[in-house]
Amino acid sequence: MSKLRVGVVGLGGIAQKAYLPILSQAADWTLVGGFSPNQQKAQPICDSYRMACFSGLDSLAQQCDAVFVHSSTASHFQVIGELLRYGVHVYVDKPLAETVEQGEQLLALAEKQGKALMVGFNRRFAPLYRQLKQDMNQPASIRMDKHRADSVGPNDARFTLLDDYLHVVDTALWLGGDAGQRLSGSLRINDVGELVYAEHHFECGETLVTTSMHRRAGSQRESVQAVTDGAIYQVNDIRQWLREDSQGVLEQPAPGWQTTLAQRGFDGAIRHFLASVSNQTLPETAGEQAIAAQRVIERLLRDANL
């Protein structure tokens, strides 16, 4: 079987930091090339990864089986729609689109075209989070915190919730069993409409789930704590694992050989998508799973009149 031909749309920071370093290590696929409207900036990036620099989305799509989209959220609806109509499988950075309605249209188009459309919720593929989900026995509560040292603004609260808090909601509800009912919560917005703090409480079956983010906490800390039947688990910064029970505390650091991109789930997400395309199976974060957390965020925004 011939190797998958892979392309990249949008060659900014996230593509350069998280995706191209993995995609360029092609073994089971071929990295064909990239496209960005800013050809002057795109050319040296493509040259550095020894891939073609395409002048248009159409010409890239015609040479690819699957494309990774890292362009602005505002462009997602148009870019993904075009790629799907060209018959290309698509992986896109979260959120899927600017609105849930646009996302639903893209999911319907992907189903109609018979193509995979996966949203890159990389934390679902972080090894320690996957281990936690597997090992938890009857979790009573799960709490996820993802804070920023000093990142209030410059964007408004809506942008920050869809750009960053979305990760917290998606990961926490996935750990809790996906379908969550919101019980309570609060958004603290400053005088110019920027998010300062968010905390929400959900019920996922028998599990209570809490999400929390402070934009000026003086720390970049990310942690998940799970209180379960027989043990308490703590995962710190996606690289340190602690399990406490009656026998004591077991600490399991991430393997020294494991890259940061693997720890944070980017490597797993990329390989899962490409394997799904090759095997013609549905990616984990496709369909309703691609948009469930965004539905929650949009309800938070409506309830807060944002």
Describe the function of each predicted region.
Residues 49-91, 95-106:
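Beta-loop-alpha module in the N-terminal Rossmann-like domain of NAD(P)-dependent dehydrogenases
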Residues 46, 59, 66-69, 115, ...:
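C-terminal helix-rich "cap/oligomerization" subdomain common to oxidoreductases
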Residues 1-49, 137, 274, 306:
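N-terminal Rossmann-like dinucleotide-binding module
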Residues 120-127, 150-182, 269, 289-290:
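Mid-domain beta-loop-alpha active-site segment that forms a flexible
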Residues 163-240, 267, 271-280:
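Contiguous beta-strand/loop segments that form the cofactor/metal-binding neighborhood of enzyme cores
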Residues 97-152:
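A contiguous active-site-proximal alpha/beta segment in oxidoreductase catalytic domains
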Residues 15, 55, 92, 117-119, ...:
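Hydrophobic residues in well-ordered beta-strands that form the structural core
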Residues 122, 225-288, 292, 306:
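C-terminal glycine/acidic-rich active-site capping loop/insertion
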